[in-house]
Amino acid sequence: MQRFGFALGLMLLSGCSDASAPPGAMCTGLSGSKMVWVSGGSFVMGDGPQYDEEGPPQTVTVQGFWIDTHEVTNAEFAAFVKATGYKTMAERDPPKLPNAPPEMLVPGSAVFNIPSDADPRWWRWVPGAQWRHPSGLKESIVGRDNEPVVQIAYQDAEAYAQWVGKELPSEAQWEYAARGGVAALPEPVDANGRPQANYYQGAFPVKNLNTDGYVGRAPVGCFKPNGFGLYDMIGNVWEWTSASGARADASEAVNIIKGGSYLCAANYCARYRPAARQFQERGLGTDHIGFRLVDTKKAGPAS
């Protein structure tokens, strides 16, 4: 990322199992990489008029493709790093820019911050924040192999995709898959009102009721899959797509992220929907952005 633009964009970053009970700490998640085939088709992409950037709705057709059943995990990304020695954007030395705050002259990344009178920022730059330490050096992913990897910039996701021979989904592929064959998805709750995705319940950002069993990221696969057999397309972490976008305040090129995260709440942004989209600087990861991949080169299953 061109980090001189980070201070301007910091406030504008995206904020946003067993069905019988919240999974809670009992769920260890899914391990190993698996893909499912999603047959092509036409659907109405987008939404409106609540969020201008999601509309107008339009009919889009996608060809069949393979897609990861879950977000890329810490364990999967660790295997990539071990094999290649890859360093993520957050681990690299930033440019030595004049007048930059000292903390932005060392490797680090953006971490969510609950605003207060003493510190009204929604996001802060934390030295040492990277995929092994998502919120800074005091947090470790040890013992969290099956959680989605975060603090991943677009370039990092692309590098992983090239290594495994896959690609990031287009926005249309992602949204078609997220809908799971259903044109209009209801609120992600069961008949008794219990959450069926990892998003923020309560008054964001001051009171998290934790009804879904998670304050932060959940291991992948702890909630019921959608109609295509895909987990966590809604909530948990935002996911990169290959689609570029535009944001007037951005200091560099942006791409579209989809799906919402554990920070999305009904009272604040309600972005835990297939049509939701945000525009994220390619060079900047955060502690609530991850990714999954598709494969359009591999032939579909024999009919």
What are these language model-derived features?
Residues 1-5:
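Bacterial N-terminal signal peptides that target proteins for export
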Residues 20-24, 37-38, 44, 49, ...:
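Functional-site microenvironments in short loops/helix caps that host divalent-cation chemistry
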Residues 73:
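Acidic-aromatic/histidine active-site loop/patch
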Residues 287-300:
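Short, structured beta-strand segments at or near domain termini in extracellular proteins/domains
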